Design a protein with these regions (language model features):
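N-terminal nicking endonuclease/strand-transfer module with a His-rich metal-binding environment
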Residues: 1-217
């Protein structure tokens, strides 16, 4: 599994509301695959109710400014032997361990060819009002916890420089991007040199049937 922290704009009410609304979209998840850790007094998990619950906690501690939430995505390879229900339990356990003391919305998306679990965490603790902070060291510890939980369940641990099956990624090997990643990359870094290079490579890959043809197009 890969646990990625989404570092987008997280300091406005609108951004938090939009994130919660997206995570709970009915075409991506279901009621049985959603949960909120910590205090949540509603029977139904609805994006507006979750949003208002997070806001109430912030206002209770007079900490309704700055970073509003954290967003993590735990994803599994399409060939991983894991069910949506197992991914859901994984996400809940991770949230309760890593984000202990903070309300976290857990929702599994199963609309893609790979299962992934979204965690949206309130930035203010319901225990003592402290703000959520993640350092580089914290991110490494987060990775270690994810790997430990995978190991306990017999799931694959992602290793840098290796494919899902454990084989080495050869130097110079081209790894295809999916459409969503490409569009996100294009939107965020459209004007950068790196983006131009990536787009040129992706364009050249279209309809290529051999390495020689790819080199010719480049």
């Amino acid at each position: 599994a890969i646990n990625k922290t989404i570092n987008k704009r997280t300091n406005t009410h609108g951004a938090m509301r939009n994130c919660i609304e997206y995570v709970l979209r009915q075409d991506k998840t279901s009621e049985l695959l959603t949960y909120v850790t910590g205090p949540y007094r509603h029977d139904e998990i609805d994006y507006d109710l979750v949003y208002r619950t997070f806001l109430e906690e912030k206002k209770m501690w007079n900490k309704d400014t700055g970073r509003m939430y954290a967003h993590n995505i735990i994803s599994w390879h399409k060939d991983e032997q894991i069910t949506p229900e197992q991914a859901f339990e994984f996400g809940k356990e991770f949230a309760e361990k890593w984000f202990s003391g903070f309300q976290t919305l857990v929702a599994v998306h199963k609309d893609k060819n790979h299962i992934h679990c979204h965690l949206v965490t309130n930035s203010v603790s319901y225990e003592d009002g402290r703000k959520l902070h993640n350092t580089k060291k914290d991110l490494e510890c987060m990775k270690q916890l994810t790997n430990q939980m995978c190991r306990e369940r017999g799931l694959t641990i992602a290793e840098k420089g290796k494919h899902f099956d454990g084989s080495e990624i050869e130097k110079g090997e081209v790894i295809a991007w999916n459409k969503d990643k490409y569009n996100l990359f294009r939107q965020q870094v459209r004007d950068s040199f790196v983006a131009d290079c990536a787009m040129a490579v992706l364009k050249a890959l279209e309809n290529c049937i051999s390495k020689e043809k790819f080199i010719e197009k480049m």
